[in-house]
Curated annotation (Swiss-Prot):
It comes from Thermococcus sibiricus (strain DSM 12597 / MM 739). PROSITE patterns: RIBOSOMAL_L10E. The keyword Ribosomal protein applies. InterPro entries: Ribosomal_uL16, Ribosomal_uL16_arc, Ribosomal_uL16_CS_euk_arc, Ribosomal_uL16_dom, Ribosomal_uL16_euk_arch, Ribosomal_uL16_sf. This is Large ribosomal subunit protein uL16. GO terms for cellular component: ribonucleoprotein complex; ribosome. It comes from the Archaea. Keywords: Ribonucleoprotein, Ribosomal protein. Belongs to the universal ribosomal protein uL16 family. Pfam families: Ribosomal_L16. GO terms for molecular function: structural constituent of ribosome.
Length: 180
C-alpha cells in the first residue's frame, strides 16, 4: 500500500494511544541513530529547531531530516566539527482502516465493522515550542548549521523556527543574528 500524504497524520486532535499491546504487528522505528558527528566535542553554540504548533511528525520525515542534516554538515563542515541530536522519538502508532473501493467492493469489504485499523507507521507527538533537533557547532560553522536547519525544517509538516543558545543554555538568537 502506498504512503499516505503527511497532512493526514500531522494533526494532534485525539489523545495518544499508548496501549501497544493491543496493536498487533506494530512496526519498529525506522530511525535508529539519534546522535551523529562528534558527541565528545566542545562547541560554542547550540542551534535548536522548534515547532511553532502542536504536531505529529512521522518517522519517515525524521529520517529524511536526519540524512539531509548529516549529508550537508559532513560535506560543508566536516564530521568532527559538529554534533547533532534528534530530541524526539516516534512512539505513536499510526493506523489505517483500509476501505474497499471499486466494482463489487460491498461483497468483500467490511466497511466500519471492526474498524480498528492496521498499523502503517510511527509518529512523534510534539507540543508547541518543543525542540525537534539540536546541532552544536563553533562560531565559524554557524552559518552552515543555520542553513542545515532550514533544509531540515522543509522535511517537517509544520512551521518551525530555530533558536541559538550559548554553552550555558542562554538564548542569544537576536545577538548572534545581528552579527552575522
Amino acid at each position: 500500500m502506498a504512503l499516505r500524504p503527511a497532512k493526514i497524520d500531522r494533526y494532534v486532535d485525539k489523545p495518544a494511544y499508548t496501549r501497544r499491546e493491543y496493536i498487533r504487528g506494530a512496526p519498529g522505528p525506522r530511525i535508529t541513530i539519534f546522535d551523529m558527528g562528534n558527541p565528545a566535542g566542545d562547541f560554542e553554540f547550540e542551534v535548536s529547531l522548534h515547532t511553532a504548533e502542536p504536531v505529529q511528525i512521522r518517522q519517515n520525515a525524521l529520517e529524511a531530516a536526519r540524512t539531509q542534516l548529516n549529508r550537508y554538515l559532513s560535506k560543508n563542515v566536516g564530521r568532527s566539527n559538529f554534533h547533532y541530536k534528534i530530541r524526539v522519538y516516534p512512539f505513536q502508532v499510526l493506523r489505517e482502516n483500509p476501505m474497499a473501493t471499486g466494482r463489487k467492493a460491498d461483497r468483500y469489504g467490511n466497511g466500519m465493522r471492526r474498524p480498528f485499523g492496521k498499523p502503517i507507521g510511527l509518529a512523534a507527538r510534539l507540543k508547541k515550542d518543543q525542540k525537534i533537533l539540536t546541532v552544536r557547532v563553533n562560531k565559524q560553522h554557524l552559518k552552515f548549521a543555520l542553513a542545515a536547519m532550514k533544509r531540515a525544517s522543509m522535511k517537517f509538516p509544520c512551521k518551525c523556527y530555530y533558536r541559538i543558545y550559548d554553552k550555558e543554555g542562554n538564548d542569544i538568537t537576536t545577538k548572534v543574528l545581528s552579527t552575522l
